Swiss-Prot record:
InterPro entries: NA-bd_OB-fold (IPR012340), RNA-binding_domain_S1_IF1 (IPR006196), S1_domain (IPR003029), TIF_IF1 (IPR004368). This is Translation initiation factor IF-1. Keywords: Cytoplasm, Initiation factor, Protein biosynthesis, RNA-binding, rRNA-binding. One of the essential components for the initiation of protein synthesis. Stabilizes the binding of IF-2 and IF-3 on the 30S subunit to which N-formylmethionyl-tRNA(fMet) subsequently binds. Helps modulate mRNA selection, yielding the 30S pre-initiation complex (PIC). Upon addition of the 50S ribosomal subunit IF-1, IF-2 and IF-3 are released leaving the mature 70S translation initiation complex. CDD domains: S1_IF1 (cd04451). GO terms for molecular function: ribosome binding; rRNA binding; translation initiation factor activity. HAMAP family: IF_1. Belongs to the IF-1 family. One of its GO terms (cellular component) is cytosol. It comes from Rhodopirellula baltica (strain DSM 10527 / NCIMB 13988 / SH1). SMART domains: S1 (SM00316). Pfam families: eIF-1a. Residues 1-73 form the S1-like domain.
């Protein structure tokens, strides 16, 4: 396997649930991104609803899309 790209994580709040396990997330920085659920979260049936605090992994190449990697308790 190759080295993973240098993605960075930010905290945010889910504002809207969309189709195909996509969500609109308001980041702490004030930006809003589209994010999908990571495969391991889908595998373990972790549910995400609007209002949840989540950790989003963003690629440095496209800061408008992300991947939800953790849901705060």
């Amino acid at each position: 396997m190759g080295k993973k790209e240098e993605a960075f994580e930010v905290e945010g709040t889910v504002t809207q649930a969309l189709a195909n396990t996509r969500f609109r997330v308001q980041l702490e920085t004030g930006n809003e991104v589209m994010a999908h659920v990571a495969g391991r979260m889908r595998k373990h049936f972790i549910r995400i609803v609007p209002g949840d605090k989540v950790r989003v992994e963003l690629s440095p190449y496209d800061l408008t899309k992300g991947r939800i990697v953790y849901r705060e308790r």
